[in-house]
């Protein structure tokens, strides 16, 4: 008996392993015939995940052959393709209509609005109604900042904050370009901490299977630098967030399968960013939640997709009280609410790069870091490839996952592992020089950001002279960078100024004579990568 999984990338590996554990033969489809998970499958077909009819024909051949137990995906945009095939073949899943509601953001927002589920005000734009007058009208109605997204994409691709009319038009153009349907959605900005929540919907029950705090940084983009599982929350806030997620899932029509929410807790209570009809990507459903809870969420989701009872889910879940906020105080409970709670803490953190061309990728020290479970570099980050400071979550360079009984230990382990990664860049390249010289696009004010706050011209003038050839940089940290303001400040790699100096001394014990002001200015702009780049460019 076969299980058909859409996608053959890293995010689908937990599903492949879980299906095999359940005794099924695993068949994969993906447009990329070099995808990394293909070798783990029993059969692979090169089919674009957008091609519903092509997937359906392949699924029919499996069903008519040795049998097809389920069609499944996790961490892709294509839950609607899953539901389309399942509905045609009478297999368990969300309905195709519900899956479309959970895939197309304008449909999603309308469902929320019709059901009075708290979510931002929105407008739809495409190339036909995209005019300056329309942009002015929208901005006058919801004000700045606002958010622009493609209606049908994930990974924050084409998604950004818009802070002025100058930024509005370029943002909409990009969102329309990366949208599969050529549509963008404009929303009011929601201010508040953001959470990712996974759940399984089954027989009128809604069981939360992962509740994480997302660490979103670097406006105008929404870059997830990591997440921590579980989130630490007041019980009432916790229950309100779950209750509003459940109301949103019900409004979309999700009844049989997985659901995943990105949701904020604003000054007015929970508001939904979006809900997908699938398990989350971003290492949550397949890594941090199973680690922290001891529950194989993917396996339980697959059991539902196979029409079987998710026994471990039912055995370990606890009741959650339905609790509404002022924005939906008259709402009726949509499902019976449960949660399988995390027992430990798992932290995921990402590492990133400043712009340039990769010359080396290495760990600064070979010392094993306690509590680190996974070290996951992106396959796209290799010698001679271009890297950039991320504008979406696909452009990050890698991820680390830790697990510990204690929150502080888990977080510190992940951060220490990230700080131990070094991506060296080719010397004297335009992209890196432009970054160090603060060149930015007109519609990206102050982006990419700096690693540390800049010195004033008077403070910079205090840094004089040269750092002698082959001398330890740690012995030449300027006094202006030893103040309390800089001692505890860390960059995106979780390094302080003194950390950077010590790591430079490990990476480049032999270096040329360096202009001190130029060197430390580069450190403030781009951290350790910039320090090594400046040194290498002087040779």
Across the structure, where does each feature detected by a protein language model lie?
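Active-site nucleotide/adenylate-binding loops and adjacent lid/helix of ATP-dependent enzymes
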Residues: 104-185, 191, 203, 231-243, ...
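Glycine-rich active-site loop/lid that clamps phosphate-bearing ligands
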Residues: 350-383
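Short amphipathic alpha-helical segments
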Residues: 156-158, 345-347, 396-400
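ATP-binding N-terminal substructure of ATP-dependent carboxylate-amine bond-forming enzymes
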Residues: 1-98, 128-130, 309, 316-336, ...
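Internal nucleotide-binding/catalytic subdomain
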Residues: 159-270, 276-281, 291-292
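Short beta-strand-to-loop capping motifs
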Residues: 127, 163-164, 199, 351-355, ...
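Active-site "cap" helix and flanking loop/linker of ATP-utilizing ligase/carboxylase catalytic domains
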Residues: 240-261, 267, 276-359
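Short, flexible turn/loop "capping" segments at secondary-structure junctions
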Residues: 37-38, 150-152, 221-222, 281, ...
């Amino acid at each position: 008996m076969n299980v058909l999984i859409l996608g053959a990338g890293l995010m689908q590996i937990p599903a492949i392993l879980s299906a095999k554990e359940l005794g099924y033969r695993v068949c994969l489809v993906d447009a990329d015939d070099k995808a990394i998970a293909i070798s783990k499958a029993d059969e692979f077909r090169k089919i674009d995940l957008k091609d519903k009819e092509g997937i359906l024909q392949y699924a029919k051949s499996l069903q008519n052959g040795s049998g097809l137990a389920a069609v499944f995906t996790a961490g892709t945009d294509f839950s609607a393709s899953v539901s389309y095939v399942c509905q045609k073949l009478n297999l368990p899943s969300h309905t195709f209509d519900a899956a479309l509601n959970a895939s197309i953001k304008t449909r999603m927002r309308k469902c929320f609005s019709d059901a009075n589920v708290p979510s931002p005000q929105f407008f739809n734009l495409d190339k036909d109604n995209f005019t300056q007058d329309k942009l002015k009208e929208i901005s006058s109605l919801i004000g700045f900042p606002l958010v622009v997204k493609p209606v049908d994409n994930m990974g924050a691709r084409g998604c950004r904050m818009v802070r002025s009319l100058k930024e509005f038009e370029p943002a909409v153009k990009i969102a329309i370009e990366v949208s599969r349907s050529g549509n963008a959605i404009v929303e009011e900005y929601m201010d508040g901490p953001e959470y990712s929540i996974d759940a399984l919907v089954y027989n009128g029950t809604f069981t939360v299977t992962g509740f994480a705090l997302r660490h979103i940084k670097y406006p105008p983009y929404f870059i997830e630098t990591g997440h921590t599982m579980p989130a630490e929350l007041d019980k009432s806030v916790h229950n309100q967030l779950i209750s509003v997620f459940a109301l949103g899932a019900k409004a979309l029509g999700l009844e049989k399968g997985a659901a995943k929410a990105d949701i904020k807790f604003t000054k007015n209570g929970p508001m939904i960013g979006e809900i997908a009809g699938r398990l989350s990507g971003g290492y949550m459903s397949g890594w941090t939640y199973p680690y922290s809870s001891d529950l194989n969420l993917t396996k339980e989701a697959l059991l539902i997709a196979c029409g079987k009872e998710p026994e471990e889910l039912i055995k370990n879940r606890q009741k959650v009280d339905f609790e509404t906020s002022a924005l939906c105080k008259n709402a009726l409970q949509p499902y019976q609410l449960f949660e399988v709670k995390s027992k430990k803490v798992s932290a995921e953190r990402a590492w990133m790069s400043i712009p340039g061309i990769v010359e080396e990728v290495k760990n600064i020290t070979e010392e094993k870091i306690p509590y680190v479970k996974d070290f996951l570099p992106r396959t796209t980050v290799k010698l001679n490839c271009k890297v950039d400071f991320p504008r979406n979550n696909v452009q990050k360079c890698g991820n680390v996952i830790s697990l510990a009984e204690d929150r502080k230990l888990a977080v510190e382990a992940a951060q220490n592992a990230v700080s131990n990664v070094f991506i060296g860049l080719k010397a004297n390249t335009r992209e890196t020089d432009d970054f160090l010289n603060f060149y930015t696009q007109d519609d990206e004010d102050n982006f990419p950001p700096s690693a540390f706050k800049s010195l004033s011209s008077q403070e910079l003038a205090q840094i004089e002279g040269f750092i002698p050839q082959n001398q330890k940089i740690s012995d030449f940290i300027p006094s202006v960078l030893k103040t309390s303001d800089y001692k505890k400040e860390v960059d995106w790699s979780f390094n302080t100024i003194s950390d950077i100096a010590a790591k430079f001394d490990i990476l480049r014990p032999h270096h040329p004579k360096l202009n001190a002001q130029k060197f430390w200015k580069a450190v403030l702009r781009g951290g350790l990568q910039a320090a090594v780049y400046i040194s290498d460019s002087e040779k």
